[in-house]
Design a protein with these regions (language model features):
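Residues on the solvent-exposed faces and adjacent turns
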Residues: 225, 229-231, 238
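Residue-level detector of conserved catalytic or cofactor/ligand-binding positions
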Residues: 239-242, 246-249
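Feature responds to low-complexity, polar/acidic, surface-exposed segments characteristic
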Residues: 2-46, 54, 59-107, 114-138, ...
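Glycine- and small/acidic-residue-enriched microsegments that form turns, hinges, and capping elements
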Residues: 231-232, 248
Length: 249
């Protein structure tokens, strides 16, 4: 059995905010997954998508649709990462000629570049509207979580028949995500070059986050799993945090 570990996603850590305050609370949405007509309560993704939407991480494509089986774009993923970690510092992204200041995602891309989770497709292109591949998604999340790539360098990927398709630049991040039990692939394949769907990305977050804290106050009850704080003025009794194995993707 892999060693259980604590991962505190206090919107906090990872070079975005101090541990005392979360700035992302203002962006939290009150929409529920069940508000969208294409959300399927019986689908494999139901719990993961519900958690992502209900806690303000995943937004709809329109007022009535979520498009859970649609491809996630690079800009959409940047926005979710920023909402999760409450980032506020922006980078100069003027070098990326395909990121217009008039687009909704301009600030999200600037935040993601400053955080170090995003690089361009080239020195002058970010391709924000392009779908993001599964190996790119694993890379972004691994960077955001600051996983120790060296400690996962010997992660065994032999169970996946398509492991040779993983790009060399992505391999350390894929090993880390698999080694941390956050990714388990599509059966016997990782499909690293396939586009990741919105539901699949929601599932990754569901595998990572065990507890959402959405109300101010002191939490002195047992807390299971990793923590994502979605408000400010929260006090945690850390001795009461317990770790459980994540749901498999």
């Amino acid at each position: 059995m892999k060693k259980k570990r604590i991962l505190a996603l206090f919107l906090a850590a990872v070079s975005c905010l101090s541990l005392a305050v979360s700035a992302s609370a203002a962006g939290t949405t009150t929409r529920k997954a069940t508000d969208f007509k294409d959300y399927d309560r019986t689908a494999w993704y139901a719990e993961a998508v519900s958690a992502a939407v209900d806690n303000g991480l995943l937004y709809g494509k329109s007022s009535t649709t979520l498009d859970p089986n649609g491809d996630m774009t690079r800009a959409e993923m940047a926005a979710i990462i920023n909402r999760s970690f409450g980032c506020y510092k922006v980078a100069d992204i003027s070098q990326y000629k395909d990121v217009s200041k008039s687009k909704w995602y301009y600030k999200d891309v600037a935040l993601a570049v400053q955080m170090g989770t995003y690089n361009g497709r080239s020195n002058s292109s970010m391709a924000p509207d392009a779908p993001i591949s599964r190996q790119e998604a694993m890379t972004v999340v691994a960077r955001a979580l600051e996983l120790d790539y060296d400690s996962y360098s010997k992660t065994d990927l032999s169970a996946f028949s398509d492991r040779s398709e993983i790009s060399n630049w992505a391999l350390p991040y894929v090993r880390a995500m698999v080694g941390a039990d956050y990714i388990h692939g599509r059966g016997k394949v990782l499909a690293p070059l396939d586009n990741i769907t919105r539901a699949e990305f929601a599932q990754i977050f569901y595998n990572i986050i065990g507890t959402y804290v959405v109300s101010k106050g002191t939490y002195d009850k047992d807390i299971k799993g990793s923590i994502l704080i979605r408000t400010d003025e929260v006090t945690l009794q850390l001795s009461l945090i317990h770790i459980s194995e994540p749901t498999r993707l």
